[in-house]
């Protein structure tokens, strides 16, 4: 089966929208965007027949993607991404960044799909010494740690 699709979580946010533009111009892939619109916007949608927008949460990625065998890569940008607000909305941050990301990781692992994950200077900056400065930085650093272990345990790519 030809893998001719990519998934972008957070596809209606700044990074996701710009990646969609790049993929439209440089590839032939069909693109599926999953976004809960907590920070992304429908006004960022690109009107192109190769792009499909799905309103949904990354926690439900296995239900939202009907035919994972056609997916070549998941670009995972759909996380809670506000440092200051992560103190005010800690449950939302953990749900999105830990539970939602874990669902994306498991979806990719189970279906042998390549994952591109977006790290952050909030957990990598200052030689990693800032990884516990906020709930946001903590969740991102734990995700990086989990991905390193998944790579060792399961040869996850």
Residue ranges of predicted features:
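N-terminal Rossmann-like NAD(P)+-binding domain of SDR-like oxidoreductases, especially those catalyzing
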Residues: 1-157
């Amino acid at each position: 089966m030809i893998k001719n699709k990519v998934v972008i979580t957070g596809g209606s946010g700044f990074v996701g929208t710009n990646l969609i533009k790049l993929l439209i111009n440089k590839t032939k892939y069909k693109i599926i965007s999953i976004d809960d619109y907590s920070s992304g916007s429908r006004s960022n949608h690109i009107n192109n027949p190769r792009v499909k927008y799905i309103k949904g949460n990354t926690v439900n990625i296995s239900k939202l993607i009907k035919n994972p065998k056609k997916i070549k890569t998941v670009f995972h940008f759909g996380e809670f991404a506000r440092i200051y607000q992560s103190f005010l909305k800690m449950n939302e941050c953990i749900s999105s960044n830990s539970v939602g990301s874990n669902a994306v990781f498991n979806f990719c692992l189970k279906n042998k799909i390549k994952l591109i994950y977006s790290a952050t200077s909030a957990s990598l900056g200052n030689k990693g010494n800032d990884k516990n400065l906020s709930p946001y930085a903590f969740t991102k650093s734990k995700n990086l740690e989990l991905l390193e272990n998944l790579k060792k345990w399961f040869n996850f790519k």
